[in-house]
Amino acid sequence: MSIDIDWERATSGPDGELLAERIRSFIHDKFQQMVLPRFIRSVQVTSFNFGTIPPELEIRDLTDPFPDFYEDGDEDLSVSSEEQSPMREQADRYRERIDSWQTNSPGGLEVQMSGRMGFGHPLQLAPDEDGSRLHPLRSPINLGDINPYLFPRSGTPGIPGGTSNLGYFMPLSGLSGSQTPLRAVTRGNPFSGGWPDSPLENESRMGHGQGPPRRRSEVNVDAIQSRPSTVNTGNTLFSRGSVSTGDPRHSHSSQTVLANNPGQAPEANDSPVSAVPPLSGTPPRRMREQKAEDFQVFCRTKYAGNISLSLTAEILLDYPMPSFVGLPLKLNITGLTFDAVAVLAYIRRRIHFCFLSPEDAYALIGPETGGGGGDTMEPNSLRRKNLSLLRKIRVESEIGRKENGKQALKNVGKVEKFVLEQVRRIFEEEFVYPSFWTFLV
């Protein structure tokens, strides 16, 4: 199904001029960021115009949007509250409470834990509306309590624990049961305690054989088996300045101190591993909820118009010495031709727009739109030819100032080739999937 576009109405008027200025500014910024050849200096994009010839559009398919379009980025934090999920709102409340507590509490974190709270009481915050609580920070691992048979190292005078390549925050709760010192487990010795001066370490040493039963800070190594724990490096409320969007009530780790009752012992079947979510090297992506009214359109786009782009630069001559003289350059792109598949997705007041590469278009739409000009092409031929979405770009260049109505130089191929390569690169990096543009409507 073909679509007719009122090109003049869409590209003229105040809105059209504003859009053209934004595109000009965007291309200008991209040229400022790229590395220029030695003989070109100070590239400036002076004007951009949509032209008078509209593109030809043909709808090919209607599907569900790509999953990447549902990703909730940092730029979406200003969206109205009705679009935010309850989990995200709860995470934002936790972040605000943490920032408020750090701002209003005098002294550092150690003063809060040891001076005001005392050694016998874990750090507690007021429960939220749903009854969930924030977890206290844990002390670093005492490397001196490591079994020497597991990590052999030579002792060094003056350095407690010897010289080991073991990381400072490397967790020890994931050691297998076959390598665990059983006497330490049966006697209730905390295998992964904190530093000697930490409140949790002092409390665990004072409580042997005289007081409360074992708390969650004392890890059951046999229950974990050989799976290493990553709680020290991953799922913390202060990591990377952001809060995980998972439900805080289900984010308890094996080293979490009981905040409800410090003297209450965990149940026998309380497995710390079952509550630890799988962690990866990158934080999980926040995704919006999919709705039935979301849709995506695949549209074949053909364009052979008179779009124009003007650039100015300076060419340096190295004779008789480097950068001896600079000649002004004016370069005009007077039109281009391309044939591609455009993707237009509508998701709750947002429009996501991008183009597909020839290989992706062949896989999703078919061989009819895989190559330019409607030719049927196989994927191997597409990779071999390395086709670009921009088929032809018409360029006119003028070098030097006019003297007696004549130009000093015209249509210098080396300069034109560089500019065309950069225009193609900017277009493919910014407009071809997985890159896409989002517009609020």
From Swiss-Prot:
Positions in coiled-coil regions: none
Topology of this chain in the membrane: Peripheral membrane protein
GO cellular component: endoplasmic reticulum membrane; ERMES complex
Predominant cellular place of this UniProt entry's protein: mitochondrion
Cellular compartment(s): Mitochondrion outer membrane; Endoplasmic reticulum membrane
Residues of the SMP-LTD domain: 1-441
Region (Disordered): 70-89, 180-289
Domain description: The SMP-LTD domain is a barrel-like domain that can bind various types of glycerophospholipids in its interior and mediate their transfer between two adjacent bilayers.
Protein name from the UniProt record: Mitochondrial distribution and morphology protein 12
